[in-house]
Amino acid sequence: MNIVNDIASSKIQVHNLNFYYGKFHALKNITLNIAKNKVTAFIGPSGCGKSTLLRTFNKMYELYGEQRAEGKILLDGKNILTDKQDVALLRANVGMVFQKPTPFPMSIYDNIAFGVRLFEKLSRAEMDERVQWALTKAALWSETRDKLYQSGYSLSGGQQQRLCIARGIAIRPEVLLLDEPCSALDPISTGRIEELISELKSEYTVVIVTHNMQQAARCSDHTAFMYLGELIEFSDTDTLFTTPKMKQTEDYITGRYG
């Protein structure tokens, strides 16, 4: 295992992270650096800890009981695991998109405006501009500009997922976490999301969990392979997929297990 990125180029630094579901030790001594304005992918078999690791970056685990993290996660040099961390501000700065599209039960416009209203006081014109900006960034504006006040549920599955991405970036986070964002989508919608991910890294640090190794190879700059709660190998994506250093990594990417 190698850390890949030096501190100067890192947005997130993870040091000796351990995570527990009750007494179950789910993440074991994880250390890695997530590069700024790059796409980092976490791969590995089901139950390896990749989604758990992702959710430590905005402390989503605090929504549930009997879960705790130990170690350090530095976001721009500040440890987010301390009790002093404002969780609401953290989640505004570290947005998240889940496996299944989760539009709010409201209009397309209000799906985007909802989070913005929690953190900013904008005029109607400013909010209109922000909604258009977010939908444009998510490659959805041309498809929704004439039906902004229709329900978010009226969109197709792929459009709903892009709406969730637009909602996530509308509050202008610096990091975007994607937890298997294409697993419920058809190949065409998946292709559009992958194109979007590649475009977003110019402005955001993106971390994606995926079961699809081809997707990781297409979309990411760096890839981490995890197994049974441990970080087995972390490298630039081309190197990990073509010349992995660890036999476990090679076995997984060649289909011998997982």
UniProtKB/Swiss-Prot annotation:
Q: Does the keyword Membrane apply?
A: yes
Membrane topology, record value: Peripheral membrane protein
Reaction catalyzed: phosphate(out) + ATP + H2O = ADP + 2 phosphate(in) + H(+)
Note the InterPro entries from the entry: AAA+_ATPase (IPR003593), ABC_transporter-like_ATP-bd (IPR003439), ABC_transporter-like_CS (IPR017871), P-loop_NTPase (IPR027417), PstB-like (IPR005670)
Entry's EC annotation: 7.3.2.1
Top-level EC class, please? translocase
* Any GO BP: phosphate ion transmembrane transport
One Gene Ontology term, aspect cellular component: plasma membrane
- Database matches in PANTHER family: ABC TRANSPORTER I FAMILY MEMBER 17, PHOSPHATE IMPORT ATP-BINDING PROTEIN PSTB
Q: What's the subunit arrangement here?
A: The complex is composed of two ATP-binding proteins (PstB), two transmembrane proteins (PstC and PstA) and a solute-binding protein (PstS).
Q: What is this protein called?
A: Phosphate import ATP-binding protein PstB
Specify the species. Photorhabdus laumondii subsp. laumondii (strain DSM 15139 / CIP 105565 / TT01)
